[in-house]
Amino acid sequence: PVRLEKVRGEVRFDGVDFDYDSTPPGSSKGASKGTLRGIDLTVPAGGSLAVVGPTGSGKTTLSYLVPRLYDVTGGRLLIDGVDVRDLDFDSLARAVGVVSQETYLFHASVAENLRFAKPDATDEEIVAAAEAAQIHDHIASLPDGYDTLVGERGYRFSGGEKQRLAIARTILRDPPVLILDEATSALDTRTEQAVQEAIDSLSAGRTTITIAHRLSTVRDADQIVVLDGGRIAERGTHEELLAKDGRYAALVRRDAHLAPVVPAV
């Protein structure tokens, strides 16, 4: 296995296919949910990519391939030019951080839950990460602060709070590549704003791939890709895709429940 000492964070999908049941490409069997076909994409180090598309288009599957939760069934996925299948486990684990829709908290203190990401983190580092993730004030208001027990028999955090704890964990880990699978659950406006500010703190200076379920958060991405049936249907910036008036523009209209979108001149 290859050990990457210093990860810049370029991510490249080179003709990537993926099948949950490993149906050979080109077979007559219809594309199943989550199948990917012929994905060619490069996200430069420090760049941002947003992936959008209807349910079952393969968005979340795409995010699973970078940290090797699944392996590609065709083509290659490269980090800094190295196939992820050739990287040693430590290099890959240090290179890629994932903030998923599901955040698991252990029956332990808040501090221990955060320290899971970096066992040697100092108290100061934990507080700084929580502040960046917009969750410090809430933790500080709990009866035992960072020593408050959480989990099944302890304090129960809300969905938005859990998400910010996951972001704080990832800030502590400091990975060069970030995979962000947005929560589909509805958050109130204030919570959503806090979560978005936490995400902005986290993604600054990192290669960020966002699996977007709401389009309001993707317009600033360097590159937006629309997946449909496991293939790339459109790609470009927010403005370019609105001007095309294709699938992305239709998704934006549906998302905003607005009249036809007129791109800014």
Model segments located where?
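ABC-type nucleotide-binding domain
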Residues: V2-V265
